[in-house]
Regions:
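Active-site neighborhoods and metal-handling regions in enzymes and metal-associated proteins
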Residues: 1-179
Length: 179
C-alpha cells in the first residue's frame, strides 16, 4: 500500500503545480502539506513513511491551500478497498452529514442550524458528532470567524449572511463524541 507520506507528496506537488501554497506546511509548526487521519485518528494526522494504507482502512485527507491570497480548506474520507459494513456506513453517513450541513447553510439562517442538521442525521444513523473540533471561517486567514460546530440548536449562533465563507467539516464517530 501507499504511505501517508506518499499522499502528502502528491498533495504538495499538485498544489505547487497549480500555483498554490500548501497552507498547513509550517502552520504552527505542522510539518506537512496535508493532514492524513487513519481509522481512529479523528483529524490532524501527520503524514509519515510508517503509516501504510491497508485494505479495510478509512482515511481522511484534509488539504488547505492558499491561492491568490485566499485560503481554501477541504477534506474527504475514503475507504481503502473492501471494508466492514459499519465502516462503509460511517463514511457514507459522514458524507451525508456534510451535504445536509451545506443544505442547512442558508442566508439569514444561523450557524446552529448547520450543527443541528448534522447532529440529527448522525444520531439517527447511530453515530455521534465530535464536539471538541469544528469548522471555521476561511478567507484571508486560515481560521476566521465563525466557528461552525457540528452539533447544536436551530436558531442559535452567528447569523449567516451572503458572502460568508466557512468550512463545514463534520467529524462523525462510532461510539461517543469524544476524541
Amino acid at each position: 500500500g501507499m504511505s501517508t507520506l506518499g499522499i502528502d507528496k502528491l498533495v504538495y506537488e499538485y498544489t505547487k503545480d497549480h500555483g498554490g501554497i500548501p497552507a498547513t506546511l509550517g502552520y504552527e509548526g505542522f510539518p506537512k502539506s496535508c493532514c492524513t487521519s487513519i481509522n481512529e485518528v479523528v483529524c490532524h494526522g501527520i503524514p509519515n513513511e510508517f503509516d501504510i494504507l491497508e485494505e479495510g482502512d478509512i482515511i481522511n485527507v484534509d488539504c488547505t491551500t492558499i491561492l491568490d491570497g485566499y485560503y481554501a480548506d477541504a477534506s474527504r474520507m475514503f475507504t481503502i478497498g473492501k471494508t466492514t459494513p459499519q465502516k462503509e456506513k460511517l463514511v457514507r453517513v459522514a458524507k451525508e452529514c456534510l451535504e445536509i450541513g451545506m443544505e442547512a447553510a442558508k442566508p439569514f439562517g444561523f450557524v446552529g442550524d448547520i450543527g443541528h442538521a448534522i447532529e440529527k442525521h448522525a444520531k439517527k444513523n447511530g453515530f455521534s458528532v465530535v464536539r471538541d473540533l469544528c469548522g471555521h471561517g476561511v478567507g484571508i486567514e486560515f481560521h476566521e470567524e465563525p466557528d461552525v460546530e457540528h452539533f447544536g440548536k436551530k436558531g442559535t449562533g452567528m447569523l449567516l449572511v451572503p458572502g460568508m465563507v466557512f468550512t463545514i467539516e463534520p467529524m462523525i464517530n462510532m461510539g461517543t463524541w469524544e476524541v
